[in-house]
Amino acid sequence: MFSFFFSFYALSVIFSLLFKHFLSSKGVFLLNTTSIGLFWAYSLSNLNLFFIKNKLIAIHLFRWFPLSAGYLVNFSFYIDTVAYSFTLLTLTIGVFVNLYTYSYFRYEPHISRLISLINAFIASMIILVNSGNLVVFFFGWELIGITSFFLINFWGERAPTFKSAFKAFSFNKFSDSAVLIALILIYANVHDLNFEAILNVSHLYSEMKLGSTPQINSWNLISFCLLFAAFVKSAQFGFHVWLPDSMEAPVPASALIHSATLVSAGVFLIMRFYPILELSLYFKLVTALVGALTALAGGLSAVFQTDLKKILAYSTISHCGFLIFLCSFGNFKLVIVYLFVHGFFKAISFLCVGNLIRFSKSYQDLRRMGSFFKYLPAEFFFLVFSLLNLSGLPFFFGFYSKTLLFMISDVLYFRDAIFCMILLSCITGLFYSFNILYYSFFDSKKARKSIYAGVISEYLRSYYYSNTTMASNIAIFLLIVSSCLLCAYLINFYLLSLSTATDFYLVYVKTFSFTLAPLSEAALLNYSFFYWIIAIFFVILVLFSYYQKKTTAEVSLAGFFDFFLGGFFF
C-alpha cells in the first residue's frame, strides 16, 4: 500500500510540473493536496505499526539499472521507525503548507509553479528517508538540493534572491561530494548497496584499511565524510552561513526547509548510518561538541537579529545543533521526540510570521512593527503557543524534549562545558521568543506611522485580505491540532512509559553512554526543576519590565545585557 500511495503522489507531482499551464492554479492545488492528503491519511493509520511494534518493511518497486555483471540496482524502499518518523513529519507539515500556500498566494501569477515545487520538495524528502539502497539515497539527496534551489530562487528576477539560492546550492554541493565519496567507500568495503546488508554487517569490517594507505582505517574516513555532509546540510557551526540567506524563499517553502526537509536531512543521515559512524572512535565526542557549539552560536545570533525571518533562521540553526547533539547519544527515540516538537512548532511559527509580514506590507524589520495585536489576534495566540513550545517552558511539549538535553549532557566527556553551552542555548530561546512577541505585537512607541497609514480599514475588509487570512489561519490551527496530538502520542509512548527520571537514567544512560565516571541518580532529578526556576525567573522579568517607566521599547535590541538589566532593575 505504501508503494501505491507514494507512486500516486509522485505521479501527481510530475503531472502538475509538466502540465501546470493546462491545469490552472486550482487544478494544481486540488491534485497535489488530494494526493498528499491520501498519503498522509495512510501514514497515520500505521502509527502503532512502527512506533510500538517497530515494524520493518522492505519494498522493491522496479529494477533500475545494472551496476556490474550480475548485480542490478533496484529502486527500493527500506521503511523502519526512523524512516516512518521523517515521512510522517514531512507529510503532516506538507498537507497544511499546501492549504496555506493556496490561501497565501492565491492571487499571485506563479502560484501553480510554487505549489508544484513545494510538493516536488516533499516527494524528494520522502524518497531520501525511505531509500532502500545507497543509489536511491544519493538520488533523493540530490533531489532535495536541486528542488531547494528552485524554491529559494522562486523570485529569480531579484538579484539577492539568486545570490542566496546559489550560495545555498554551492554549500550543498560540498555535502553532495562528501556523501558520494562515503558511498563509494562503503560499497568498496561491503560490496553491497542495500541498507539491509550494510547496516547489519558493517561491524564485521571494522578493521578494514584503505588499499593504497593501509595506516588509515577506511571507516574513519567514511565517518568523516558522512559527518561533514551532515554538518553542512544541517547548517552546523562553520557551515551555517547559507541558511539565513535561504530566507529569500517564499514563506511556505521556508517553513518546509527549516522544519521537516532540508535541514533535517543531515540528522537523518546520522541516524541512518549510525551503525557505521559508531565504528569511529571520535564520532560521539565530535558530534556532541559541534552540536552544543552550534546551539549556542545560533541562539546568541538570534537574540541580536532584528529581521523577523532571520531570527527564526538562527533559531533553526540552534535547534539543529540540539538535534545533532542528541544524535551523539545513540537513542533514536529521543531524537524523534525532539524532531517532532521542533519541526511542527517551527513550521507553525513560520506560517504565523508570514501573515505578520504580509500585514506589515512586506516589512520584516522588528523596528518597523508594533501594536499588531488588535489587528492579528489569532496570529498572536498561534505564535505564542508555538514559541513557548520551542522555548521549552513548563506545561508545554518543548519542556519535556529540552529536559532530555540536560540529562544527556551530564554523561559525555567535557560534560561541564557541554552542560553550560546547552543551558545558555536554552535560555537564549526565551529571549528571542520574547523579542518577536513584544516588538511586533505590543511595542506601540516604536511603530512607524507609515505602517499605520498603510493599514486602513478598506484593506482589512477587502476580499483579498479577509479570505486569504481566514483560510491561512484555519490551516495553521489544523496544523496546531495535529501537532499536539502527534507530540502527545510520542511523548506518552517514548518518555512517559518510564515512571521516573531515575528509571530513564538506569535504562538508557548507563546502557548507551561511553562515560567512565559513575553519576548520582538523584542529581538527575534536579535538571528539570532547575529549568523550571529559570523559566519562572524569566516570566517575572518580562512582567516586571512591562509595567516599568523605562520600558523595553526604549532599549535597543542590540543591547542584550542592557535589556536584561534594564528590565530587572528599573
UniProtKB/Swiss-Prot annotation:
GO molecular function: NADH dehydrogenase (ubiquinone) activity
Cellular component GO terms, alphabetical: mitochondrial inner membrane
Entry keyword Lipoprotein: no
GO biological process: ATP synthesis coupled electron transport
Protein's UniProt keywords contain Methyltransferase: no
Localization per record: Mitochondrion inner membrane
Transmembrane segments: 2-22, 27-47, 56-76, 77-97, 109-129, 134-154, 179-199, 221-241, 251-271, 285-305, 311-330, 335-357, 380-400, 417-437, 476-496, 524-544
Major site of localization recorded for this protein: mitochondrion
EC number, UniProt record: 7.1.1.2
Protein name, UniProt field: NADH-ubiquinone oxidoreductase chain 5
Phylogenetic lineage: Eukaryota, Sar, Alveolata, Ciliophora, Intramacronucleata
